[in-house]
Regions:
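Cleavable N-terminal export/targeting peptides
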Residues: 1-31, 42-45, 60-72
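Transmembrane beta-strand segments of Gram-negative outer membrane beta-barrel proteins
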Residues: 26-36, 73-82
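Repeated loop/turn-to-beta-strand initiation elements of outer-membrane beta-barrel proteins
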Residues: 30, 60-63, 99-106, 127-133, ...
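Membrane-embedded beta-strand positions in outer-membrane beta-barrel channels/transporters
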Residues: 31-33, 50-52, 92-96, 118-120, ...
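Residue-level signature of outer-membrane beta-barrel architecture
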Residues: 38, 55, 97-99, 123-125, ...
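Outer-membrane beta-barrel "beta-signal"
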Residues: 46-60, 147-149, 230, 234, ...
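Hydrophobic alpha-helical segments and helix pairs
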Residues: 94-144
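Detector for outer-membrane/organellar transmembrane beta-barrel domains
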Residues: 128, 140-222
Length: 263
């Protein structure tokens, strides 16, 4: 039980040393992260890692906390990621290009496999509703169209409700999600994330609630397909922060550490 509560305990102890809160509203354009995941169960261990660099061609304004920059991406952006583990490694590229309210989508899961990619076209309505039609091409299995919609309801200058829905052209695979972002007072915020995914063979739901306090700390707890998830975050300053996650899944335990640098 102690190891499950470690992220929360560390954040709570550190809070006693935090200074008077100030709201963290900053602008960033370039987001980079390095992530390590370890899975341990009765039968095997697995180690995985991921490097991500995500660049926006316009500055992104934070919502008040240092890891939230709004629900919708509405500016041209480009992303490169490298993921690897005990049995694989991939180099992926993706991006969106905006021209007025129209935008084009491109995604390649692994640059060494040009037979698997996504191309799409979408439209942004009033900076609040983002709709796109995407074509997923696969070297194994059928190609298919995918429809995606995202909506941001801005409650005030900080609080918002975000909704997303996505499905294939035959409605066999679909997912929905929502995010609530609320400014309580000072530098105290709360976020609630919920989602559900459904396919021909299985379905899963998830939920997470996070609480931000002071300038440097956040804790969270939730469920991922009925499995316990605990999270702690430490914001070193407006450029760097750390995230630690623990997930209990049956006889397996998942540990995740991530370091983010944003400029």
């Amino acid at each position: 039980m102690i190891k499950k509560l470690a992220p929360i305990a560390l954040a709570t102890l550190a809070y006693s040393n935090c200074s008077i809160a100030t709201e963290q509203q900053v602008s960033k354009q370039w987001f980079n992260s390095i992530e390590y995941t370890h899975i341990n169960n009765d039968y095997y261990d697995f180690d995985g890692y991921q490097l991500v660099s995500h660049y926006y061609f316009e500055e992104q304004q934070s919502s008040g906390v240092l890891d939230d920059y709004g629900y919708l991406d509405t500016d041209t952006n480009f992303r490169v990621n490298y993921s690897g583990g005990d049995y694989y490694n991939d180099i992926g590229l993706s991006g969106e290009y905006f021209f007025n309210n129209w935008f084009a989508v491109a995604d390649m899961r692994d640059v060494r496999d040009l037979d698997n990619y996504t191309l799409g076209l979408g439209y942004l309505f009033a900076d609040a509703l983002k709709v796109s039609v995407n074509r997923d091409v696969r070297s194994y299995g059928d190609d298919y169209f995918r429809l995606k919609a995202q909506y941001n309801l801005q409650i005030n200058d900080k609080d918002y409700l975000g909704f997303s829905a996505e499905t294939d052209d035959e409605l066999d695979v679909w997912n929905v999600s929502a995010r609530y972002f609320n400014h309580l007072s000072g530098s105290h915020y709360i976020t609630v994330d919920v989602g559900h995914q459904d396919s021909l063979y299985n379905s899963a739901s998830n939920a997470m609630i996070s609480y931000y306090f002071g300038d440097h700390y956040a804790i969270g707890a939730g469920l991922d397909d009925s499995e316990l998830v605990l999270q702690g975050k430490y914001f070193i300053n407006d450029k760097y922060y750390l995230t630690a996650n623990y997930t209990e899944s049956g006889s397996a335990e998942l540990y995740n550490l991530k370091f983010v640098a944003q400029f």
